[in-house]
Amino acid sequence: MRSIPAEERCALLHEKALANHLAGNSESAATYLDEAFALDSLSGNMLLSSLIYNECYRFDDGLRCIRRHLRTTGADARRYRDVANLYEKTPRRHNENTALVLSIIPGVGHFYNGAWEEGALSLALNGIVITFGAAQAAGKMFVSAILGAGIPLTYTYMGGNSRAVELVEERNTAKISEFNFKLISLL
């Protein structure tokens, strides 16, 4: 089988990176970019590469690519400073596992994400269901406690846990999108 020349291989890897990025899989896109840069350090669209690396929270690689982009476009010193200042304030990634652990206490995982109203609602809703179940169990109405509290609590409690994780993903996506938008607006 004939081997592909390095230049064509780099182009193919960049196309795969773009396809993965458009499909929402930035980690795979970054892997293809790493492979392309290993073959040819000057290959590809540096702006797109920077945005992909930023989405993976690999800000050092993103800054390296954007500096290379600025060099090739002949940017002035002010743009370099603006980009460097932006990269000094990179967004912090919130951890899904932290939100899940914190949501053991209903609502706290929501508070971690800044969703105060949702957290208070989750805490109140779970509290009402637990109180109802405890009152039914105290009155020795166990079937009523299980049906009236146990089953709904399964949905409200587990739903709160999964919602806390969803909020982390939404928040991370929003913060990195805002960061990339600021970067593009500087160029």
Label every model-predicted segment.
Residues 1-89:
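Alpha-helical protein-protein interaction scaffolds
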